């Protein structure tokens, strides 16, 4: 996926969900761990040289898996490129757990699944589709997946 560099730089300056200096090792063989300032903004993980204001890279946190590798180390692996693995070293186990949790929750897919879940719950409790008022209830991206029971059809108008 291609991105406009100026837009990414602008996005990298927005308020962060999480930011810290972490050890980071890239996906190439022979890459070594380097201190990087890492910022989580929406579903992007930006990384900077510690003395610079513009990011040297960004990871789009979609279609990836986040795993704890060690007590203070986690990795990000992209599902379509298993060899593309990034390692991050934290200062503590707690910091590592917080980063893993934040990154998992940053993805569009996580947010979509939550929306579908809460939509189903609201519909179950009230009998109303909360998305109907916005005219988006029939959009595929908001449909219930096979893990959840399907929404019953709306009641006929009275």
Curated annotation (Swiss-Prot):
Membrane-spanning residues where?
A: none
Q: Which GO terms describe its biological process?
A: endosome organization; receptor recycling; retrograde transport, endosome to Golgi
Extract the CDD domains matched here. Answer: PH_PLEKHJ1
Q: Which GO terms describe its cellular component?
A: cytosol; early endosome; recycling endosome; trans-Golgi network
Q: Which Pfam families match?
A: PH (PF00169)
Q: Which residues form the PH domain?
A: 15-108
Matches recorded under InterPro entries: Boi1/Boi2-like, PH-like_dom_sf, PH_domain
Check the record and name the PROSITE patterns matching this protein: PH_DOMAIN
Origin: domain of life: Eukaryota
Q: Spell out the SUPFAM superfamilies in the cross-references.
A: PH domain-like (SSF50729)
Return the protein name. Answer: Pleckstrin homology domain-containing family J member 1
Q: Which gene is annotated as encoding this protein in its UniProt record?
A: plekhj1
